[in-house]
């Protein structure tokens, strides 16, 4: 019965902290309106009150089933154009939006927790992003993950299976749909709260946190398709193309100064080998330590004029140079020197060319804050 599912989802919101006790009636009424219902029957409410209360764990486990039954009802009642994965995802995001705090409330709480510690702030925001179903826990569980021991360390291997397959009806509808440039891409700030359409995912349950990076406005969010713990995305407030340059190193280091428990990195600014959304300047990070970060330095290096910076070639199957210093300005200067040298480097005997038919050598910088032992 849909009324019982409405009570279940409201309890889910209360248990996870998305809904305050004072907002219980309000949330129930919003859900009734969404499903074109005029009332909550007294008998249903009385019977539900006798049930065993949810816990955080049982609430998480129940969410997928609650939403599926709500979606089945919506499909039968004609509240969705088609009963397909695409339309179900659009509608269940709308359902969850009834529980999600306003952006101003999320930002205010994040900033208050940040004053206690950056980790408390990100812990809150990561939990929120999962509880709102922006990160779909039940789909993430489908991902295949394992480790492999190699001479370079224990590597993480992931096959992402959480992205839903496009259904034929949605593909056909997307071709016929009016083309829109709003939002300009999947990263733009305008996605926050957006209802979506057949060719763009719904984001009513999506929240972003403003951060200042290198004296400019950026935003912080989590990836809906989590590849590792607290997989986050840091993106420019403006829809501007990715570009690896000297300023990039300053931006990356600025972020890890603000969130020292996170790493952050930039994909290359080239197609195929680089980021999947090159049209919007962004970085990716998280609360995780990959094998490359643990790999030892197999050969120490000294750069002229940078004798105060520790440097070395990392034991890794690809070319990796690790540099460290107490002053970030020194790291920025040396990183830029290495970048410029690499982009102009050619070794024909090793089949390395600075440029071939317009394709350039690429680099992927990734800093983290490490305390010296």
Indicate residue ranges for each PLM-predicted region.
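Terminal catalytic/cofactor-binding subdomain
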Residues: 127-233
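Glycine-rich, often proline-containing surface loops adjacent to acidic residues and nearby aromatics
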Residues: 227-235, 314-321
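Catalytic or ion-translocation cores adjacent to nucleophile or general acid/base/metal-coordination motifs
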Residues: 247, 256, 260-276, 285-339, ...
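A glycine-rich phosphate-binding loop feature that marks nucleotide/adenosyl-phosphate handling sites
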Residues: 352-361
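Conserved small/polar residues in nucleotide/adenosyl-binding loops
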Residues: 362-369
């Amino acid at each position: 019965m849909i009324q019982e599912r409405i009570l279940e989802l409201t309890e889910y919101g209360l248990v996870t902290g998305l809904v305050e006790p004072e907002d219980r009636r309000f949330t129930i009424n919003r859900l009734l309106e969404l499903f074109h219902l005029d009332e909550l029957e007294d008998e249903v409410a009385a019977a539900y009150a006798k049930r065993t209360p949810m816990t955080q764990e049982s609430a998480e486990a129940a969410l997928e089933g609650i939403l599926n039954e709500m979606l089945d009802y919506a499909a039968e009642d004609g509240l969705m154009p088609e009963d397909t994965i695409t339309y179900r995802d659009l509608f269940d995001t709308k359902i969850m939006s009834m529980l999600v705090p306003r952006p101003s409330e999320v930002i205010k709480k994040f900033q208050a927790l940040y004053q206690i510690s950056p980790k408390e702030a990100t812990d809150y925001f990561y939990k929120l992003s999962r509880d709102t179903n922006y990160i779909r826990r039940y789909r993430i569980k489908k991902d295949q993950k394992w480790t492999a021991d190699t001479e370079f360390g224990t590597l993480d291997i992931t096959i992402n299976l959480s992205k839903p397959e496009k259904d034929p009806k949605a593909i056909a509808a997307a071709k016929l749909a009016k083309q829109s440039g709003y939002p300009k891409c999947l990263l733009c700030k305008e996605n926050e709260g957006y209802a979506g359409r057949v060719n763009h995912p719904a984001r009513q349950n999506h929240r972003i946190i403003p951060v200042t990076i290198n004296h400019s406005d950026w935003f912080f969010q989590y990836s809906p398709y989590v590849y590792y713990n607290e997989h986050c995305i840091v993106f420019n407030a403006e829809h501007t193309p990715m570009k690896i340059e000297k300023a990039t190193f300053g931006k990356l280091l600025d972020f890890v100064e603000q969130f020292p428990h996170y790493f952050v990195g930039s994909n290359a600014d080239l197609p195929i080998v680089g980021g999947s959304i090159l049209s919007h300047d962004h970085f990716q990070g998280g609360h995780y330590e990959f094998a490359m970060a643990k790999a030892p330095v197999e050969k120490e290096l000294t750069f002229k004029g940078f004798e105060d910076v520790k440097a070395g070639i990392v034991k890794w199957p690809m070319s990796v140079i690790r540099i460290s210093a107490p002053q970030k300005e020194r790291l920025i200067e040396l990183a830029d020197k290495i970048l410029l040298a690499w982009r102009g480097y050619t070794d024909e005997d090793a089949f390395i060319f600075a440029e071939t038919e317009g394709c350039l050598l690429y680099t992927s910088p990734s800093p983290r804050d490490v305390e010296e032992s």
